[in-house]
Amino acid sequence: FDEVGYNLSNCYRLPEGQTGMQFWPEEVGKKLPNELGLYDMSGNVAEVCLDWYDEYGGEDQVDPVGPDALPSDVPQKRICRGGGWNTNTSACRVSARAAFPVDKRNKLIGFRLVHPKLENVQ
């Protein structure tokens, strides 16, 4: 895991001239890519997704689709996937799922821009 991801055990450093460990997200692309060629998919920061957060139903589903919007009387939360530098290795996986309020900011959370592969680009 250390070659491709960040977690609580491998993201600390001691800035020059300072005492005490400090923890924070790392610059993108400093670790090796995973088997799909993607960087920083495990650890570093958890990622907010476009999907609204709601509890899963009782049945198993593959790629469940959430609502387009939530009722105004329901707390507005997005799905947050994966673990970050502040979590242990077992939580640094893309299937880790949590809720994150849309009106909050946090140095533990980021997002990933995704674009389909462009064909015949010169």
What are these regions (language model features)?
Residues F1-S42, A98:
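Short, well-ordered junction/capping motifs at the entry into regular secondary structure
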Residues G20-W24, D40-Q122:
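Surface-exposed recognition segments
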